[in-house]
Amino acid sequence: TDYVVKLGPNIADPYGSVTGQALTVRFRTGDQAPDLRLHIPDFVGTYNAYAPARLYASHVNVKRVDLKLYRLTPEDLLQQNSRDWYTNAPPASALVRQWSQALEAPLNKVSYAPIDAQEGGGPLAPGIYLLVASSPSLKDNNYGLRHLMVVSKINLTLKTFQDGALTWATDLQSGQPVAGLSVTFY
């Protein structure tokens, strides 16, 4: 965007000094730096395995997002928990889906794009997943581009007290209690 600022010769500062001459300043601003973020409330999210696994990305001046979806075991999660999630990747054998998605938006305007973790927009099977997003438009900033997805058909309500805990397990679709479920606390 081009800007022109014109200053008159009689502009005074707080002490009464005036510019004494007219001045024209011209400048141009560049395009906004490319940016991409997964539009999520936190690093970890819970997802209903009965519903499509969809989230959104906010983007500006980015034409493509590259995505990888890894399926993790509970053991992977516990081992990874002590590492840096932003620099370590799961093993290639854990990769369940890799794809690219075109992004369209006017120049310098923040826009939002849906991202379906399951091809075709369906639900993911229950499990733990790591979604990793990247783009060739970005430099080294990958903050906000990884998301741990815990997908389940069961809702757990946890009540804790001084020397114990109690949990209720209900089916997310029917709302009915889930009988015989083995629950492990870490």
Language-model features, listed with the residues they occupy:
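N-terminal, cleavable Sec-dependent signal peptides of secreted/periplasmic/extracellular proteins
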Residues: 1-186
